[in-house]
């Protein structure tokens, strides 16, 4: 095997190992709850909501940041469901698209994802000193 080929294979292997490690660490803050509904909500959230809400894309509130959610967890769930299902223009030019931009999600699926995000946010709020 030539040195060039060896280096290419080595770099590829290192990239695979690092990307797997990053992916595993990336899901770590998204804890799993015991409730069947929250387990289902977590799966929906990871597939549909994480892209914005894990990174603050377009001003999306991050559930792991208590400051982003302290005022939201006290709102009626019906309000949060409505914002997630029908879309919402928030302060500072933030925007929640209808159904997170996935028109195939049912109302019930959106509610499960919202419930998971609320539980995740409350978990991090409760962990504050």
Regions found by a protein language model. Give the residues of each.
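Short, cysteine/histidine-rich loop/knuckle motifs that typically chelate Zn2+
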Residues: 51
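Cleaved targeting-peptide boundary
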Residues: 24-31
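Bacterial N-terminal signal peptides that target proteins for export
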Residues: 2-11
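N-terminal signal peptide c-region/cleavage motif recognized by signal peptidases
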Residues: 19-21
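Gly/Gly-Pro-rich "capping" loops immediately C-terminal to redox-active cysteine motifs
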Residues: 42, 54-82, 101-102
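Axial heme c-ligation environment in periplasmic c-type cytochrome domains
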Residues: 62, 83-111, 117-129
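Local sequence-structure signature of Cys/Sec-based thiol-disulfide redox active-site neighborhoods
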Residues: 39-48
């Amino acid at each position: 095997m030539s040195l060039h080929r060896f280096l290419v294979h080595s770099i590829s292997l290192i990239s695979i190992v690092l990307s797997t490690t990053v992916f595993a660490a990336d899901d770590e803050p998204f804890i799993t709850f015991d409730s069947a509904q929250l387990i289902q909500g977590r799966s929906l959230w990871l597939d549909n909501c994480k892209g914005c809400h894990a990174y603050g894309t377009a001003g999306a509130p991050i559930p792991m940041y208590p400051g982003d959610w302290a005022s939201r967890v006290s709102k009626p769930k019906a309000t949060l469901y409505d914002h997630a299902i029908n879309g919402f223009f928030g302060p500072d030019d933030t925007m929640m698209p209808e159904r997170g931009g996935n028109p195939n999600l049912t109302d019930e699926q959106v509610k499960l994802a919202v419930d998971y995000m609320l539980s995740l946010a409350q978990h991090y709020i409760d962990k504050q000193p």
